[in-house]
Amino acid sequence: MEDKDELSRLRALFHTFDSKSSGRLEKGQFSALCAELKVSPSEAEDIFARLDSDKDSCITFEDFAMGFRGARGLHMPEGKKDVEQGEPPKSPSTPDKEEKPEETSSPAWEDFQRRLADEVNYIPRREQASILYQNINIVEPLLIQQYEHVIRNFVREIRLQSTEMENLAIAVKRAQDKAAIQLSELEEEMDQRIQAVEKRVKKEEKRKSEEALNDLKRQHESEVAELQVTIKKLKKLEEQSKNINLKEDVAVLRRRLHDLTMENQKLRKDLLEAQTSISFLQSELDALKSDYADQSLSSERDMDIIRGFTDERENLARQIEILQTANRKLHDSNDGLRSALENSLMKYNRSLRTINTSPGSTISRNSPKLTRCTSPYDRSPRSSYLDEDYDSLAVCDPMQRMNCEVDSLPESCIDSGLSTLRDSNEYDSEAEYRPPRIFHRSRFPHENYGGDASDTDVPEIRDEESYAPDNGGNLDWKPSNPVSRSSSGASSSRKCISALSANVTSAETVDKVHKYTHAEKAYKIVLAGDAAVGKSSFLMRLCKNEFRGNTSATLGVDFQMKTLVVDGEPTILQLWDTAGQERFRSIAKSYFRRADGVLLLYDVTCEKSFLNVREWIDMIEDATSEAIPIMMVGNKADLRQLMAEQGHICVSTNYGEKLSRTYGALFCETSAKEGSNIVEAVLHLAREVRKRCDNEDDRGSVTNLSAAISKKPAQMKNCCNV
């Protein structure tokens, strides 16, 4: 046990010298340590050589312990080994441990204690200090003075600290005494205040009691005075009653009693009559109340029906206005075609006159085969009669009229074979609506008659027009495959100018027109969201494929129509662009009641618009009786990186997906400026809307356009007959 304690103390001493904590002392470290302890370099080298037993130029803990034990065995007798180890021999006669080092301490240590005088009491762990003193005295006596100097410094600091502690204790005691004095003063002051309050309350209570007592005295005096007055009156009445004759009084009283009895009976009769009339009036009032309640309910139902009729009337009026605009445009186009027809007839007549005057005209008149058709513009008398009937029908029927006008187009309308590029915006107009038209031109058979007449084969020329229902007032035109016209006598090739799709055949176009004209349902889609999130730009990109950076804020509600092919079927969408400003929220909320779907937009570069999405969804749920499909659209995705680099807080895609999953809504990020994911978002929402409406029994929110479509030919007929 003693060896373990000795090793632990030696290890602690070694670690104090080992500043690098490497477990060994280099020669440089040992020299620096000896220089701090004021040991000469020669003595330091001698001590290092004695401690470095394995001659590896470093002192390990084992070398240090071995050298320390060897030095102790040379200089100390064996009887004092316990003193070196710091464990004095235990003796039952000396139980006090503090007296053991004094008995076994060296004379040098005792002399040092005498020199310290009273400061010895401030040395902590005096036993360990004495052991270290003896060890240093044995190993290196020159270090004793430095060790004594260190101990004196420690004793001085400990003494100062003890003095400071005493001063602090005195200060704390003074503070406690002062606090106690202040507390006693506060208690005295509180007692004084309480006494003053008690005195004031007692005075007030005494004053109030005196006032109450005075009031009671006054009341008592007034009552006594009233009693005295009544007593006097009673005495006077008693004196008067003694003087009145009793018989006369009895007769008068009987008459008065009889009169009062009759009056009482009459009043009772009147009371019964009044109660009866009140009961009748009450029953009539209840009947009137029930009638009023029934009438109010019926009036509310009528008002709801009227509101529904009003909405339908507004929709129909809007559609009629669109059709009227389309009719006016058709009328203008008919005028243009009529003028073109007149010009073509003039050219046709001139060409006939030229042919009649040519030498080949004799063959044309004499040959029965040539009377059928010798040129694209020659017609037989029979065909002329048919053409006259056809033209007369065209005057009444706008569809036939358009066919006739196209059949008689002049040669200037025939292309030379060079393609002409047209902007798609040339055919797009916000208020333009055109019915489906299919132009057919009959094929004229031609035969070859030797070399007298030129052989010109005129194949069938069909001008077709791809039609789609009103897409927000925009009509999409697609150029069709041009049909070539060849001639055996000439190598020229000409193409018919057409505004139809280049990748759609005639049969496909007819099928598409048939499908589009039978799309009777229009689904109401409402665009919602905060102001300046890009709803109007989204709608403009969807309907017109345009983007304008200087669009103004929407006031109230804007309306557009768009037709999309969803799962192979044409779907007409009514797109309602609502204002996102706070003052128009009530208007936007009213449009949610009959909506089939909602496009809820927010700005990915504006965190506030994303946080307000929950309020918009709550508004939609409050306004609708059933759950409707919602497509959450994060717009302006193209600006997110730029705004994030500028330090703005942007909404990431993960946040939008989590929020959409929370509410069971669809989600998509778009860019109205770049046009990305615009059509995809609307297609997904339209698909969900169609699924929901197909599964519902109540289809009140779907507008039936069959009546409006059936009226289009009649309206166009009336328009053309003007």
From Swiss-Prot:
Biased composition range(s): Basic and acidic residues: 75-84
Ranges of biased composition (kind: Polar residues): 355-374
GO molecular function: calcium ion binding; GTP binding; GTPase activity
An annotated GO cellular component: perinuclear region of cytoplasm
Ubl conjugation keyword on record: no
Subcellular localization: Cytoplasm, Perinuclear region
Domain EF-hand, residue spans: 5-39, 39-74
Chain segments annotated as coiled-coil in the UniProt record: 156-335
Function noted in UniProt: Binds predominantly GDP, and also GTP.
Family named by the database record: Belongs to the small GTPase superfamily. Rab family.
Subunit: Homodimer.
Name of this chain's protein: Ras and EF-hand domain-containing protein
